[in-house]
Structure formats: C-alpha cells, structure tokens
C-alpha cells in the first residue's frame, strides 16, 4: 500500500521485452539493498515487485496484465518514472491510500493553464464513471490527486506547481 506522494523518481535504463512480459531496469537514488528484494515499489502508479538491486539500479518484472493496463506498454529508455516505497507503520499519510492496482490508462483531452496551476481534462470510459466522484481521489502515474469536476465521459484534476515539480 502507498499514499501517492512522490519523493523519488527513476530513469528507465533497460527494457527487455519478453514474450508477454517486460524485465525493466530503473536507475534511482532510492536507498534499497538486497534485503528489500521482494518488496512492493509503486512505479508510475503500479505496484511492482523488486526482483534485483545493484547499487542504484532496480529491476522489476512486469506481467502481461500490468502491461495492458498501464503506460508501461509505451515506456522507453531514458523515460522518467515516479517511484514510491510502500507505507511503513507509523509513517505520515499525505495523499490517499493507493493499492497500486491499475484499472486503465486514460487520455488527457485538454490542458488549461489557470495562473500557475494546470487543469487537466481526462477521459474516462463510461463503465468506470461510477468510481469517479467530485472531491474524491484518483491516482495518475502514482500521484495522488483530487478530482475537481466530473462530466459524463471525463473529469478534471488541478495540478499546482509543487505537484508538477
């Protein structure tokens, strides 16, 4: 379980496409060691199991199901990804509870700048609409965000400069 607050990023350094899966290597400044192998790491919103650690390089195996439902289907070398370690007992919860079980990829339909903030209009298939409520939470690429407006086939989120950084 995670909370959707991103303190670390990683850079994709190797993508090994297998028959129906991906073996992914990410360079990161996360302080992990061999004792952390098997731990859950939130990578762009998806809960992935850490399978290898070597210095600042983290390896993950991505299943076919995860590829289908996430942006890992279009990931490239040198892409930046959001990383978050799982919540530890007693740690601060700043976002919302994030399981890392991704339902779908959506498209950004429109971006509007309002002052120093950005409003993103994001499409949502009708069958998922019932889960999207105004002032509710949504996780996008691992980031906990508040839904500011809901329409029939899309919803809005507002991103402040701190979140964008």
What is the role of each PLM region?
Residues 1-165:
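Conserved loop->alpha-helix
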């Amino acid at each position: 379980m995670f909370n959707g607050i991103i303190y670390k990023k990683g850079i994709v350094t190797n993508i090994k496409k297998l028959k129906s899966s991906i073996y992914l290597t990410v360079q990161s400044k996360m302080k992990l060691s061999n004792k952390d192998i098997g731990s859950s790491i939130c990578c762009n919103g998806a809960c992935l199991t850490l399978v290898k650690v070597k210095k600042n390089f983290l390896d993950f195996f991505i299943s076919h199901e995860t590829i289908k439902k996430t942006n890992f289907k279009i990931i490239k070398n040198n892409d930046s990804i959001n990383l978050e370690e799982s919540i530890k007992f007693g740690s601060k919860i700043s976002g919302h509870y994030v399981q890392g079980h991704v339902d779908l990829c959506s498209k950004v339909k429109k971006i509007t700048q309002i002052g120093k903030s950005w409003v993103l209009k994001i499409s949502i298939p009708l069958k998922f609409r019932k889960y999207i409520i105004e002032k509710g939470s949504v996780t996008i690429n691992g980031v906990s965000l508040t839904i500011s407006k809901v329409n029939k086939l899309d919803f809005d989120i507002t991103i402040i400069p701190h979140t964008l950084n």
